[in-house]
């Protein structure tokens, strides 16, 4: 137990105690603005809010004073213009302060990360596991596993618990007090992990970096114990497959697990012995897979329930943890339906004058495209109806024909690009058909003609031109031993940039 406490003890010698004054430094907001322009995170122009992108300490000070005075919260129901104006100001306050919070709150973690590797050689494959390690895991090791534990990370976390966890890293009371006030003030505008609605979409979009940081910090708290178990037990040594995704790593801080491990710790470690245990996560969903027995997975499930209950004061619902056998169930992860299927084959073995026929079943990874959810997403975006019948896109009829073709082509290429790792690409033909015919109907509606006459006048080449690019890219990657069409439909190609288009369901 003492060894565990020494491991969980923080190195407080490098903590920065004074972060509140940084809120009034103009360069902090310049960094936030540059980050929005260079890190490929959507950043709306401040001209929308009648603001000229010039930050100053005086403006920030006024915003903080107004927040504390709460004058902007007095909304008159009879005055709709006053209500719109106050909501407009609330958006401006939240965006400016959250941008400052996002930059400042990352400083202690960034300093600790840099200082921890001073004079040391960084082992990138171990310490900076990313989503890219998931692809070789699926191809090389996933087929040898038997059971999988689907985990939905617990949410929503209470805002006070989130601030208390940050207190272990940041000791500036003024900064934490303002952060607590800010979170409580705007928690109705956006939840850290729940689905986005129309009324909080603006808040999430304009403050994405800040809330991604808070969400990643919460996720780190929920899975940090795996770091300790991996270091203490050689049974959890699969570092190439233990991938803490989202690249947000905070080292050295784990505490309050004494309640879970209040008994003999070595005995508890023995309960989780498994030489083939793997853990990986993407966003709010994580997977634990094992070659062991269902009893072992049940032990891990009970452990996670106790961890969430004692550490996060969260009562876990039964639907957040599912134990499935890979041979009988599909794994819904990264937008794919993955499963392990035995692939029987016959081998003829010749030994001197005797010949033997051996039946061998080799496990094969199947990654299937979820067609029904994709069609539902297309229907939600008004590309087709719920039965998959293509319809025109009325919202795009005011655009030029070239822009319409480019939009449809970009969506179609993104779908092909994202699901290039599928083992059955022919299932995407229905999605491509919906997009092609929807594009044709939109163009025909734009020119006030029928689809038949439009296709007869222009031909079908204009529908093919935005589908060729993806096939050309694959033709350069794959060997040219066989026909390109057969090759493209059978080969799995994992692109490292698919997380950029993981919001594939948001096609509008």
UniProtKB/Swiss-Prot annotation:
GO molecular function, a single term: RNA binding
Key words of the record: Chloroplast, mRNA processing, Plastid, RNA-binding, tRNA processing
Cellular localization per UniProt: Plastid, Chloroplast
Biological processes annotated in GO: mRNA processing; RNA splicing; tRNA processing
GO CC term (a single one): chloroplast
Pfam families: Intron_maturas2, MatK_N
Keyword Cell membrane in record: no
Its biological purpose: Usually encoded in the trnK tRNA gene intron. Probably assists in splicing its own and other chloroplast group II introns.
Name used for this protein in its record: Maturase K
Protein source organism: Ranunculus trichophyllus
